[in-house]
Amino acid sequence: VNHTLWQVPSSMQAYKNDIDADLYKQFAASLYGKSVDEVTKAERQLAKVAQLGLGFGAGHKSFQNIARLMGGFDLTLDEAYEIVSSWRQTYSEIVQGWKTCHSSLSWIDNGIAESIDPWGHCVTDSRGVRTPVGRINYPDLRQQTNEDGNTEWVYGQGRKEARIYAGKVTENLVQHLARNIIADNMLAFDKTPYGRKYRPAHTVHDELIYVVDETDADGVLDTLNELMKTPPTWWPELVTSAEGDIAQTYGGAK
């Protein structure tokens, strides 16, 4: 979603060519200067950590910690810096998106209607951001000076007061859109014969989990995969993919 929201050409072309394109391997190939076929399992894993950890503005010091926690990689600061720099250069459209998200806070504060993303899906107003599937509100948005003497954006009051900044706005937009894509998939499944029989047992970020009779397991999985590979009606240009598994436990299916 993050790559398509900001129209990253290489990523969109990759998914256009192959719905199951592996962006982790593609970034690893770019990072290490080798072909996709030559990328090792460890190199792909580090690239996966980069794709998942760098999309919302993390710097090299934060990424050093992210790499250790998410992938068990013990990177030097220089190595972390090199990876972050390479990622930002490769996906410069996302970096530009962060800058636009920073500007959007001023637009909201001034009640100006402006499109944040190039698709025109996320539009500011005096309350926050309107999207095709709802809105994100930033009540009492304002600038104030923190204890270090720096000016920052915050919203909310009392215990609900929170900092808001470019990377967090980006994350809010991406997760809001992604959550609604999954919700659309879930509602579409509800209208199928299997969906009328089974309700979701749980959802986790970009996953739908169902507990079903063993005789229906293959049919349910095939139906869900088909639906989750169908782009939402409000964003037909988005390429979506899906994979799943059948197991006796949730952990066994991951």
Please report, for each region that a protein language model flagged, where it lies by residue.
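Conserved catalytic core of nucleotide polymerization and phosphodiester-bond processing enzymes
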Residues: 1-254
